[in-house]
């Protein structure tokens, strides 16, 4: 009986341990929320969120593969997007994958307004110089929603 109780306790602690977010998962999730809050306030993406090696990305517009550089500037005439249901998978101490949804309305500077922006996001993050940076991304419209109209960075 004593062994059975010990075995149950070990199994329960294993389940509880696997459900808790790791520090990496917490950091990446908070970074996504903080970067979005910055963009809501400043109508531009925060600088240096992309890896120094750049980021390969498929955008929600359905265009071709894009190569983004760390110094690429993205500005908006209107930005009211919100990240939801963020899940982060820790690959190792310096790599993580984030999956989440983004919804709201957005208008890139010089582009048309999208009042029904609704996409799925998958981003690969790497730890560089003490911070998490985007190394790859795939944005795709969710059924009933619309992606961006942009197909290239100017």
Predicted feature residues:
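Hydrophobic pocket/interface hotspot
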Residues: 35, 45-48, 54-55, 98, ...
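A short acidic/glycine-rich loop-to-helix N-cap element
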Residues: 110-115, 144-150
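Surface-exposed, charged secondary-structure patches
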Residues: 69-113
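Short solvent-exposed beta->alpha transition segments
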Residues: 47-82
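Short, low-complexity N-terminal intrinsically disordered segments enriched in polar/charged residues
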Residues: 2, 15-49, 148-154
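Short beta-strand edge/turn micro-motifs at domain boundaries
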Residues: 118-147
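Solvent-exposed loop/turn segments at secondary-structure junctions
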Residues: 55, 63-64, 103-106, 140-143
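Sec-dependent N-terminal signal peptides
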Residues: 4-14
């Amino acid at each position: 009986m004593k062994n059975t109780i010990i075995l149950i306790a070990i199994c329960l602690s294993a389940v509880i341990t696997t459900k808790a977010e790791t520090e990496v998962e917490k950091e990446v999730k908070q970074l996504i929320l903080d970067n979005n809050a910055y963009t809501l306030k400043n109508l531009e993406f925060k600088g240096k969120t992309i890896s120094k090696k750049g980021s390969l990305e498929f955008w929600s517009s359905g265009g071709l593969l894009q190569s983004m550089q760390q110094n690429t500037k993205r500005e908006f005439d209107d930005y009211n997007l919100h990240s939801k249901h963020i899940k982060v998978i820790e690959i190792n101490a310096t790599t993580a994958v984030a999956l989440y949804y983004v919804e709201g309305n957005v208008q890139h500077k010089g582009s048309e307004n999208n009042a029904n922006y609704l996409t799925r996001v998958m981003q690969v993050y790497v730890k560089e110089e003490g911070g998490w940076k985007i190394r790859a991304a795939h944005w795709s419209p969710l059924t009933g929603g619309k992606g961006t109209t942009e197909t290239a960075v100017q």
